Amino acid sequence: MTIHTDDFAPSPPPARERVVSAAPASSQEEALERALRPKLLQEYVGQAKAREQLEIFIGAAKKRGEALDHVLLFGPPGLGKTTLSHIIATELGVNLRQTSGPVLEKPKDLAALLTNLERNDVLFIDEIHRLSPVVEEILYPALEDYQIDIMIGEGPAARSIKLDLQPFTLVGATTRAGMLTNPLRDRFGIVARLEFYTPDELARIVMRSAGLLGAPIDAEGGMEIARRSRGTPRIANRLLRRVRDYAEVKGSGHITLDIANRALTMLDVDPQGFDVMDRKLLEAVVHRFDGGPVGLDNIAASIGEESGTIEDVIEPYLIQQGYLQRTPRGRVATLAAYRHLGVAPPRAAGGLFESA
């Protein structure tokens, strides 16, 4: 059973929708994601190292009848951190309670969650790097000793009492592990970094999702969707749904390589998985800032996007694919970026392109 504590939290302001954004576009999309989500580790595709470690640690915890060590999952958005938290709870045969860092505004919010956990339950906190310091302080003794201190009363009559908690597992997820405080990071016994997926792994996910959606698809069509999905399952599933719509209206309903190509071209997703925002970023660095180095704030102002979105959502894939470099002096366009834009690289670039 999963209990969401943030179902009635205020909605964040709507973001500019990008079909290749790794963030969920809407609550409807989140519901569709849940329907496609694997339930067990053996159904989970990719992340072989993390999957193997979790399989061993979960098996050992079940044999001993103990709570699993606290788990930290980090990496770019859309790679399956929430999915893994659900799988961990399912594999352990316990309840999952789900919340997020921004929702836990006061110590009493966290205390209410912790005191309602049953033995060996899983508490999933998304965006755990956004916990407030006062809430984080309450969490430390809960993680180490399964105890919390709460204040009873007000003013001079106020007193602190210690409450014992049931053993539990905290699963924390973050896209920005560097923003976690050292005391919090050190309390996680299991730390797993989720990496971008390979096209072959994404193709397996696309074919599985197409089967669940009842969408006929060729292997070639599935691979084309996978290649343009930026290494991210959430994007792969979103593109699959868009291509399915195109196939039903413009074709016979069967997703072939040709249908996938035409649909993705209509969506302005190029063969590298780049969209307008990616190209705007590369063009800004190359044309407006002479290839860099250029600071993140200057890029954000140039393309009209928040610096946090660039750093968390747009940049990681460009860096991972070798189109952008992050240096101490700022962002620098690589030779691949110049080639992608069809622009001749500068000759005097500190030797960066001389060997190419």
From Swiss-Prot:
Which InterPro entries does its entry note? AAA+_ATPase, AAA_lid_4, DNA_helicase_Holl-junc_RuvB, P-loop_NTPase, RuvB-like_N, RuvB_C, WH-like_DNA-bd_sf, WH_DNA-bd_sf
Indicate which residues the UniProt annotation says bind DNA: R326, R331
* Residues where Mg(2+) binds: T82
Single GO molecular function = four-way junction DNA binding
What does the record list as GO biological process? Answer: DNA recombination; DNA repair
- Positions of the UniProt region annotated as Large ATPase domain (RuvB-L): 5-197
Q: What is this protein called?
A: Holliday junction branch migration complex subunit RuvB
Q: Its encoding gene is what?
A: ruvB
Q: Which reaction does it catalyse?
A: ATP + H2O = ADP + phosphate + H(+)
Q: State the EC number(s).
A: 3.6.4.-
Alphabetized SUPFAM superfamilies for the sequence: P-loop containing nucleoside triphosphate hydrolases (SSF52540), Winged helix' DNA-binding domain (SSF46785)
User: Lineage from the top down?
Assistant: Bacteria, Pseudomonadati, Pseudomonadota, Betaproteobacteria, Burkholderiales
Q: What does this protein do?
A: The RuvA-RuvB-RuvC complex processes Holliday junction (HJ) DNA during genetic recombination and DNA repair, while the RuvA-RuvB complex plays an important role in the rescue of blocked DNA replication forks via replication fork reversal (RFR). RuvA specifically binds to HJ cruciform DNA, conferring on it an open structure. The RuvB hexamer acts as an ATP-dependent pump, pulling dsDNA into and through the RuvAB complex. RuvB forms 2 homohexamers on either side of HJ DNA bound by 1 or 2 RuvA tetramers; 4 subunits per hexamer contact DNA at a time.
Q: Which organism is it from?
A: Acidovorax sp. (strain JS42)
Q: To which protein family does this belong? A: Belongs to the RuvB family.
> Know anything about its domains from the record?
Has 3 domains, the large (RuvB-L) and small ATPase (RuvB-S) domains and the C-terminal head (RuvB-H) domain. The head domain binds DNA, while the ATPase domains jointly bind ATP, ADP or are empty depending on the state of the subunit in the translocation cycle. During a single DNA translocation step the structure of each domain remains the same, but their relative positions change.
Which residues does the annotated region (Disordered) include?
1-28
Q: Which GO terms describe its cellular component?
A: cytoplasm; Holliday junction resolvase complex
Q: Does the keyword Chaperone apply?
A: no
